[in-house]
A protein has these predicted regions:
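FIC/Doc superfamily catalytic core
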Residues: 1-127
Length: 127
């Protein structure tokens, strides 16, 4: 499994902000660390998020809800999820409007983490 580390997420966020606008920078390093480590947590020797889909959903929701960045939290949550899934063999096929709706829904609480997992499954065109 290929993971995204903190420096890679910071780079993706910076690049995304340059291309789409907004304020660059991290508001809280601890919240970023939490969002990046959560998908890989275990308890009693069992992974809390055992599948690639659940890890991707947790990464996305953590980056959006933790408010680690000054701006672009919805964009980086979605972007990081897509990159993570692609690096690990999943190909997500969807429209820009669907991505926007997903990010807004997660941020507002209308879409929960389990729903993100379902979204990933229904939009996966990879192997």
């Amino acid at each position: 499994m290929i993971l995204l580390n903190k420096e890679q997420i910071k780079y993706l966020h910076s690049k995304m902000i340059q291309e789409t606008g907004g304020s660059n920078g991290i508001r809280d390093e601890g919240l970023l660390d939490s969002a990046l480590s959560a998908p890989f947590q275990s308890f009693g020797g069992m992974e809390l998020y055992p599948s690639m889909i659940r890890k991707g959903a947790r990464l996305c929701c953590g980056l959006i809800k933790n408010h680690a960045f000054f701006d672009g939290k919805k964009r980086i949550g979605i972007y990081a999820m897509l990159v993570f899934l692609e690096l690990n063999g999943m190909e997500i096929e969807c429209s820009e409007e669907e991505l926007i709706a997903l990010g807004l829904g997660i941020a507002s609480g209308e879409i929960e983490e389990k729903d993100v997992g379902i979204w990933i499954v229904t939009h996966n065109r990879g192997e």
